[in-house]
């Protein structure tokens, strides 16, 4: 990876004009690969970028990674390509058609912890001043970077966005509350990324007979909830222990979160065939 080269005139480098995905590998196998690639297609469509490969071709490229049975992630990024700097798309400023720049790389990650060892996270609130197209997984992540850094400086692990009193999501994860036995989370859309792990979790919850409410959630409701947790591709589920420096209940992974995490881990094992001979296969 240290030998990779990208032009200084790549639009991703100069304008953050691109989209990306992060795909978790369990024992060398990508989880929910098709869902990630479908989201990449939606993100690319959202910025009027034509992907250089079809979803099936992208899956074939990812499956070529020879990582054995390693735990880790694949980062996939597509930008609008290389051309002289201009805010206009290349085809609108007299340029010849420009091929997109696409890159993949693998990064090893520690194996995710067992259920009894799931870590807690401390959240710090941040005013949600991001744009209105958070459903696009854009490489323009400066607002998220600033929010997360401010949270860590304040002694937290992650920033949680508040939009006029409503909890939307975190700087690098989706946010969930359990209220009277129901899972409550903000609907996807302008302010919330359609997280792949989020979608898997909510479908599993419905299969388990757990009520799911996709609706706006106030900060006051969150602070009075029975359980709070966050979820993402690289972390699965982490329970929330502190909010703006103050401890919150229940002080451990609650019963609904535990039940859902058990189902998620079993689903991952089933989809990634973790008990079979190691070989990369799409999920």
Language-model region placement:
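Conserved alpha/beta cores of soluble small-molecule-handling proteins
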Residues: 1-159, 164-166, 189, 193, ...
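Glycine- and Gly-Pro-enriched alpha-helical subdomains that act as flexible
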Residues: 162, 166-188, 194
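Secondary-structure junction motif
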Residues: 197-198
């Amino acid at each position: 990876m240290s030998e990779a080269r990208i032009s200084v005139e790549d639009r991703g480098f100069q304008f953050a004009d691109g989209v990306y995905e992060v795909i978790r590998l369990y024992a060398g196998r990508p989880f929910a690969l098709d869902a990630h690639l479908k989201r990449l297609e939606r993100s690319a469509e959202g910025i009027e970028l034509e992907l250089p490969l079809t979803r099936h071709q992208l899956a074939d490229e990812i499956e070529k990674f020879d990582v054995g049975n390693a735990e880790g992630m694949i980062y996939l990024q597509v930008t609008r390509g290389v051309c002289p700097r201009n805010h206009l798309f290349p085809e609108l400023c007299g340029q010849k058609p420009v091929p997109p720049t696409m890159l993949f790389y693998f990064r090893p990650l520690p194996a995710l912890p067992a259920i009894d060892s799931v870590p807690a996270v401390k959240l710090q609130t941040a005013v949600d001043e991001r744009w209105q197209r958070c459903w696009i997984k854009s490489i323009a992540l400066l607002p998220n970077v600033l929010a997360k850094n401010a949270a860590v400086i304040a002694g937290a692990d992650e920033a949680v966005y508040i939009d006029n009193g409503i909890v939307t999501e975190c700087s690098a994860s989706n946010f969930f509350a359990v209220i009277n036995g129901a899972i409550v989370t903000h609907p996807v859309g302008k302010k919330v990324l359609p997280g792949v792990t989020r979608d898997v979790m909510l479908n599993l919850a419905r299969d388990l007979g757990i009520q799911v409410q996709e609706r706006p959630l106030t900060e006051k409701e969150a602070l009075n909830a029975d359980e709070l947790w966050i979820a993402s591709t690289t972390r699965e589920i982490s329970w929330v222990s502190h909010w703006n420096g103050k401890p919150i209940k229940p002080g451990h992974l609650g019963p609904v979160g535990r039940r859902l995490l058990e189902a998620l881990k079993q689903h991952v094992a089933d989809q990634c065939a973790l008990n079979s001979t190691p070989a990369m296969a799409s999920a």
